[in-house]
Amino acid sequence: MNAWFAEVQQKFIADFIEKDRWTYITDGLKITIIVTLLALILGLILGILIAMVRCTHDQTHPKWFRSPGNFFLKLADAICRLYITVIRGTPTLVQLLIINFVILVSAQKITVAVITFGINSGAYVAEIIRGGIMGVDKGQMEAGRSLGMSYVTTMKDIILPQAMKSALPALINEMITLL
């Protein structure tokens, strides 16, 4: 048994230290960190935009043909719901294979990974942020609006800071999952 450990130690030293194979591990770690950070940024941007569309639709309840803005908000909400349902309903590996071999065939592999993981993370982040926004008391929006603030200003200055505070643990979990 002791000879086996000595042999494993000798092979480890020969492979990783003497033949400089440890550089493969550090190169892989660099790529992993780059892909994770870029996908995280893309996922946060997508998630916040989609959550805002979904929450605006849920809070205003627009009718289809009252105005062109209502029509586009309904259409954007339907597209966002479809995106979230499809992306959250398919495995990440399947998404990676489809984007790599069907959609972005000639792209670099790191670019494909960033886009795929960013799109996947965006769907989860959207639901996390939407849950945080919906968790803020309705009176907060009414208070901001009664002070003369616009809907966008009320969301930006009053609702989103409270929502991000309550959604932060779930967002950190999503970031760890992305890693």
Language model features with spans:
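Transmembrane alpha-helices and adjacent helix-loop boundaries
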Residues: 1-179
